């Protein structure tokens, strides 16, 4: 199965208009489903969601949850809890771990763990992101 997503044009403070690779993903937890446009980030180890998206999915910090800290560009630590849910990309549903950020100021990222091993992902000349299984 092949799925294609157009790059999204956005403003950059430094570069002006830029095209960024995105995909439409449905996050599923219990009976809750949320459709989001996420950045496809081959540099991200794990899928990252902001606090509000996790709350909409019904996430809570449980007694067995461990608050970790992850870092990206700039080495600024972000408190997260690893959660499991289902992701639907096109017609394919996968079990995935996500880093639920305990702060709001993070982008939605589709990271490598549990996702990239299932698809061939190709970035086509700043036009499309193609997922093929």
Where is each model-derived feature located?
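Pepsin/retropepsin-fold aspartyl endopeptidases
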Residues: 1-133
